[in-house]
Amino acid sequence: MSETPVDPQQPWPGLASFTEETRSFFYGRDDEITELSRRVQRKLLTILFGQSGLGKTSILNAGIVPRLRQEGYCPVYVRIDYAASTEPAEQIKQAILRATESVGRWTRPGTAVEGESLWEFLHHRDDQLLDGAGKVVMPLLIFDQFEE
């Protein structure tokens, strides 16, 4: 995620989205952030869908992600590049490994086994991600711009 500089005197990033770094300037959507955060915690799949320009990426990056990070989630941002030679499932596996390596350690460290499905990758190790204090952290897959 690239950081967008925000002027405190005029804290609107224009067409750019708010980020975790600029969340202190993101106002007025607390009820939506609370509801969507609860929904993510209760459901295996939550879809945030709407017209372009409504602030979906901003509410995600500046609202939901910081709140869920405090609740023990590790956001894994995934944007599939269909033009790449790497299969989408492999891109997702690599995004998970990259995002989680800075958070802590896996209880059964390993890498992706060539040829395994994404489901197998997510389930075969009976693994947990632990932070530096030994608390379990839950990876949260975020597919932004998924409609592309």
Where on the chain are the PLM-derived regions?
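Amphipathic helix/helix-loop-helix segment enriched in hydrophobic residues with interspersed Lys/Arg
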Residues: 1-148
